[in-house]
Amino acid sequence: MISLIEKAPYIPYPLALYEKLEQRHTLLFESAEIESKAHTKSLLMAKACLKLVCNHNIVTITSLTPNGGAFLQTLSAFFKTPIQDNALTLTYTKDKKIQDEFLKLFEPSPFDALRGLFKSVKTRPKHPFTLFSAGVFSFEMLNFFEDLPHLKANDNTANDFIFYVAQNLIIIDHKEKSAEILGACFDERFKTEIAKELQDLKELVKNIKSDFIPKKAKQSIEVSVSCDDSEFEKKVLFLQEEIKKGEIFQAVLSRSFYMECLEGLSAYYHLKLSNPSPYMFYIKDSDFILFGASPESALKYNALTNTAEIYPIAGTRLRGKDKQGNIDYDLDSKMEFDLQHDYKERAEHIMLVDLARNDMARVSKKRYCDKLLKVDKYSNVMHLVSRVVGELKKGCDSLHAYRSFMNAGTLSGAPKISAIKLIYQLENQRRGSYGGSVGYLNSEGSMDSCITIRSCFVKNNRAVIQAGAGIVLDSVPQNEANETRAKVQALIDAIRKTIS
């Protein structure tokens, strides 16, 4: 593999740049600091050369460009599998004889297809993003590893995972005010062509002088919901009975809100403007659009330090606002104090921090928790947060850590598998991207991902916005229903701002 790197002028308008490049199999990842809300970094996949799709135990790898076809040939040799119809099809079977929880992490799985991307090629020159793969893990990715029922499809039709390999990647560092463009070349024959693509991108960057201008469209403002408050509250009561029986301690029950969405990119613009978050993303597939502003890290792994971290978020309050909808700082401080000293919220949060520590223990030599019970604030809500860090055991990589963590206790419950079985019973349909993760893997071996919450899945101009609430014995059913509405409000507002 040959890596091409071009320095480019700094551009403070990543969304305006993405608008010029928006097509199928592209994505934009952005990040903002929680405290200052200042933007820190943007990653823009301008062109993908491969697409990987997982459906339960089958992974299909398809080339999207001639250069991707060359990489597919390399992968064919690596996996010892022939190419048919411009694609590789890999099938994985669980080894049910393995009982040891640590050894189970190393059984064959669809994650091996992602590992193969990086094991099959040697990168030169060395750059952390020489080879870059990014995409989505669904909530139901867990079903391959655990004995869980298969559910009917939801409007959120995201596969178990969908990942792309970048042919052209633009990296913008907003702190350093720098930019670079990377090209991944898998055959000498395509070097000149990819070098030209990088020069064209460089010219495009130079010519963008102003920010993205959002568009509007005529569409309905109506919002519908998968289950109304009354039905949701009955499900809360059912879970509380299961808690009394000792089946679970906590479960995260969710519901979906639906509305029309004709201008996804403009809705994303309004969302990130009102709700700058550590993880902001816009993904355009051939089948759907997924965008969001997630406050919660799924798994962050630094290959250089061999450390993984999880950022549990559990415990929510509305922001303190006046009648005009502006932040009332005295009221906001009272809400923050109330959240930090609420026995129910603290107990729920500590339980999920303990679950995160247990997940980390499976793959780490040592671990610790810092930032315990800190408060992060967003446009409509504030959350209790903590950070769990661990140094991975020998032989473990980012995907072993993700497997151990999947799915986040803050989106499932405790004990995790028992809670998920009850969630499946009550929700009775796939969550798809909701509660899974969005993230990337790079050639350094590092991974960064967020839990797919505060997100919107759009297919055929229909938006699915899903949100959940953590149910414990002390939960007040109406309050939990209200919490789901509070969590989706920023997305509903963002879409409504695109309506003419």
Curated annotation (Swiss-Prot):
Mg(2+) binds at residues 348, 483. One of its GO terms (molecular function) is metal ion binding. It catalyses: chorismate + L-glutamine = anthranilate + pyruvate + L-glutamate + H(+). L-tryptophan binds at residues 31, 278-280. Transmembrane segments: none annotated. GO terms for biological process: L-tryptophan biosynthetic process. Binds 1 Mg(2+) ion per subunit. Pfam families: Anth_synt_I_N, Chorismate_bind. Feedback inhibited by tryptophan. Its EC number is 4.1.3.27. Disulfide bonds: none annotated. It comes from the Bacteria. Pathway: Amino-acid biosynthesis; L-tryptophan biosynthesis; L-tryptophan from chorismate: step 1/5. Chorismate binds at residues 315-316, 434, 454, 468-470. Keywords: Amino-acid biosynthesis, Aromatic amino acid biosynthesis, Lyase, Magnesium, Metal-binding, Tryptophan biosynthesis. Its cofactor is Mg(2+). Heterotetramer consisting of two non-identical subunits: a beta subunit (TrpG) and a large alpha subunit (TrpE). Belongs to the anthranilate synthase component I family. Part of a heterotetrameric complex that catalyzes the two-step biosynthesis of anthranilate, an intermediate in the biosynthesis of L-tryptophan. In the first step, the glutamine-binding beta subunit (TrpG) of anthranilate synthase (AS) provides the glutamine amidotransferase activity which generates ammonia as a substrate that, along with chorismate, is used in the second step, catalyzed by the large alpha subunit of AS (TrpE) to produce anthranilate. In the absence of TrpG, TrpE can synthesize anthranilate directly from chorismate and high concentrations of ammonia. This is Anthranilate synthase component 1. It comes from Helicobacter pylori (strain J99 / ATCC 700824) (Campylobacter pylori J99). The lineage of its organism: Bacteria, Pseudomonadati, Campylobacterota, Epsilonproteobacteria, Campylobacterales. The gene is trpE.
